[in-house]
Amino acid sequence: MARGALLVVATIAIAALAGWGRHVRASDDSVLPSYEVLSRGVRSLWSDVESVRGELATTRLELERANSILHYSEEYQIPADLTAAIYDIALSEGITPDIGFRLVRVESGFKRQAVSGVGALGYTQLRLATARFYEPTLEREDLFDREVNLRLGFRFLKDLMQVFDDDFHYALLAYNRGPARVREILAAGGNPANGYAAAILGRPR
């Protein structure tokens, strides 16, 4: 697509120069354009080329996003608006969308009003105390807001990745069991695995 657009611009440039050449031959009084005039023309053409490249890159990203949202919506049988929210917020918080969808599926089954037996809330099953670490003024009902819940849940997972030196397995276990508990088990030489990370990642460890 980009190559085709560049060819269009190049064709326009060649046509313009050809027209100028015919004009020179048609009149003995014609004056060759100065270097400055030609230079401005070339710069203008390259500006057009770069503009087309930028527009094509943006269009390509938009198409990739639309295709991904359609794919995840079909895979998990969830509405497109929820799919788009999970996809966009995961990316904005530094989480791969695939993990974002798997996390929400395991945690809440994509149910906005999900409440666990220990009081974890919403799509990502956050506890209010954890959410208030990021936004101290939050109320319980705020965690049923789609954007708030997804954003803070994914941010919490991203922060756990840093705590556990980018070990995604331990970060997921800490998301489920709590970081203090996972560190305690590891310090005692134990294995904190409880099946949760495997449920998200699809493989045992």
Residue locations for each model-derived region?
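N-terminal secretory targeting signals
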Residues: 1-77, 205
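Catalytic glycan-binding domains that act on GlcNAc-containing polysaccharides
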Residues: 48-205
